[in-house]
Amino acid sequence: WSLNKAIKSGELSPLDFAKKARSFDIDAIEYVSGLYTNHTDTLKKISMQKLSKELLKRSDDYGIDNVLIMIDSQGSLASSNKKERLKAIDNHKKWIDLSAEIGCKTMRVNLNGEKDLNKWTKNSVKSLTALNKYNENINVVVENHGGLSSSGKYLSNVMSKVKLENCGTLPDFGNFCMNGSPWGNCTQMYDRYLGTEELMPYAHAVSAKSYDFDDQGNETSIDYKRMMDIVKKSGYQGYVGIEYEGNRLGEDDGIIATKKLLQKFI
C-alpha cells in the first residue's frame, strides 16, 4: 500500500511491484487486491489465473518472497444479511486460491458490515471459520481496520472463539480509529499500544504504519521502540511490513525512512 499513489496514477504498474521492492533492497512483499481491481483495470485485461502466473514469475525473477495479500472490497464478512455474508465468503475464496498459487502463506481480510458487537462477533466467527477451513495451508487473518475491528479487545475475542491455528490477526500500528475518520477527525481512538499487545498473540503478520518523521528519523505519532518491544515480547518471528501513508515525504522516501527506523529496533 505504500506505493498506492504511484500505482493509481499509472506511474507504476502493479505488475512491477516485485521489481520496485528489489530497488529498495527488500526481499519480501505484501500485495493489495484493490490495486489489481478497483484502482486499476489489471483484472479487466487478464484473468485471475494469468495474474497469479505473472506475479509469481516476476517475484521469482527478482528473488522476492510473496508473503501476504490484503483483500478489500470483496463484500462484508461480518454482515447480518446471510446472503450478503455468504457472497462475501465466496468472493474471498478466489483470493485464497491466488494466495496459494503465488506462495503467499497469509491473506488479510476485513470484518465490516455490522455495528452491533454481539452480532458482529457471531458473524465474524462464522465467516472466518469458513474461510480458514477452505484451505488450511493459508492463514486468513484480520487487520484492525476501522469500526469494531479496531478494538484489540473485541478482535482478540473473535480470535479466541474461532480456535483455528491458521486464523489470526495482522496488527497495524496505526489503524485504531473506531469511529470517525482516521485522517484527522477520529472521534473514538483505541489505545494503539494496548491494542497491539492484545492482538500480537494471534499475529501472523504485522504492519508498521508510518505517517511522518522528525529530524532524527523517528515517527512523529507512533513510538516505534515501544511498538517493536511489544512485537518482540510476544515471540513473533515473522516479517514486519512497511506501510507508509504520509503526505510530506514521497512514497519512495517514506518507505526508506520506515525501513531505516525499523532496522533500529529489530
Regions found by a protein language model. Give the residues of each.
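A cross-domain feature marking catalytic cores of carbohydrate-active enzymes
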Residues: 31-35, 68-73, 109-113, 142-146, ...
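Acidic/histidine-rich catalytic cores of soluble enzymes
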Residues: 28-29, 125-229
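Active-site clefts of carbohydrate-active enzymes
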Residues: 203-216, 237-251
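N-terminal pre-domain/capping segments
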Residues: 1-102, 118-122, 129, 152-153, ...
